[in-house]
Amino acid sequence: MPIPKAFALLGPTACGKTALALKIAETLPVEIISLDSALVYTGMDIGTAKPSASERAFVPHHLIDIITPVQTYSAARFVEDCTRLIGEITARGKCPLIVGGTMMYFRALTQGLNDLPEADACLRADLDEQKQMYGLDFLYRTLQKVDPETACRLKPNDSQRIERALEVYYLTGKPMSEHLGRQSPHTLPFDLHTAALIPENRARLHENIALRFHLMLEQGFIGEVENLRRRYPGLTADSPAIRCVGYRQAWEYLDGKTDFPAFVEKGIAATRQLAKRQLTWLRKTPLDCVADPFSDGTSCTRLIEAAKRFFGA
C-alpha cells in the first residue's frame, strides 16, 4: 500500500499563504492542516488572522480552535495530530495541505523530536516562584552555570525557554544541549513535498504587516484581548497564548505599561521580527519549490501546478 502524500506550504506571516492555499483548494480536493501555533486557541481570532468562517466552510481546516488560551499545545502534540490527520485525510480520498509558518513545529515533523521529558507542573511552579522572588536574571544566571551552551543561544529575557531548559536539567540531570545533540535519525511516514513563499521585496512584506496590524485594530483586536482577560482570569503576560505576537503588546497596553502609539509600534515591530525569524528558518529548510508572492503572479501559479503534479491531478 503506497504511503500517504502531503504538500506543505510555508512562508512568513502576512505573505499570502492562506490566499494561495484557497487557490490550491479551487483545483484540488484538499483539506488544510494548520501549521500555526497561535491558531489552536479559541477566542483568539482577530490577532491571529484566523481564516474566516466562509474560508473554513469552503475547505475543511484542521488544528484550529482546538484548545482554550489557558491550555497548552506542543510540537510533540502537533507531530502526533498532523501525522494522524494526513492518514485520515488520505483515507477520505482528499489531499493533505499543511499551511503555516510555525517552523519549530515543521522541524519537529520533518526531523523528529528530541527525547525530552514532559513538562512538570510542580517543578515549573517552583521555577515561577523563583522568578517572582529573585527575577528572571537569577534563572538565567543559573542556566549559565548548568547549561552554558543553551544559555548562550537564548536571550536573557526569554522566560519560557530559560525555564524549560532548567526544567529539563532538573528532571534529567543533563543539560538540554546534550539532549539536543543526541537526536536520532528520523524517517517520515508519508511523502512530503515542501513549498514556500519567500518574498524578495522585504519592504513590501513590512508594509503588509503594518497594514494588517492596523486592520486588526479596526476589527476590534483590543476588545478581543480585553475579553480574554475577563473570560480567563488565570491568563498572564507569560502564558503561552499571550506570548503570541501582538497579544503580549496588547496585554502590556491594557496593563498601562505603554501608551497606544507605542503599543502599535511595538506590535508591528514584533511581527516584523517574527517574519525575519521565519525567513531565517526557511533559509535552512530543504525546499522543493519556492515562489515570490509579490511577483507578477506566475510564480505562485507554479506552486499550484507543483501541487497538482505531486498529487497526480
From Swiss-Prot:
One of its GO terms (biological process) is tRNA modification. Substrate binds at T13, A14, C15, G16, K17, T18. Residues 36-39, 160-164, 243-248 are annotated as: Interaction with substrate tRNA. The record marks T102, R124 as: Interaction with substrate tRNA. PANTHER family: TRNA DIMETHYLALLYLTRANSFERASE. Belongs to the IPP transferase family. Monomer. This is tRNA dimethylallyltransferase. It comes from Neisseria meningitidis serogroup C (strain 053442).
